[in-house]
Amino acid sequence: MLGWTLMFLVVAIIAGLFGFTGIAGAAAGIAKIIFFLFIVLLVISLLVNALKGKAPRA
């Protein structure tokens, strides 16, 4: 859990730097691409788990 906390802290700091320095427009375009990429990966992961017959871990 500490690892996740540190990762989210770093992400929050980077997001704050982007927001306060005015380069948020470029970062937003990249974020949209990454968002849809991870949505596709999520769907693929769910399909693979469904085909294997395993329940997803909580």
UniProtKB/Swiss-Prot annotation:
UniProt keywords, alphabetically: Cell membrane, Membrane, Transmembrane, Transmembrane helix
Predominant place of localization: membrane
Cellular localization per UniProt: Cell membrane
Membrane topology label: Multi-pass membrane protein
Keyword Cell wall biogenesis/degradation assigned: no
Keyword Transmembrane: yes
InterPro entries per record: DUF1328
GO annotation, cellular component aspect: plasma membrane
Pfam families from the UniProt entry: DUF1328
Transmembrane region(s): 6-26, 28-48
Family of this protein: Belongs to the UPF0391 family.
Protein name, per record: UPF0391 membrane protein Shewmr4_2671
Species of origin: Shewanella sp. (strain MR-4)
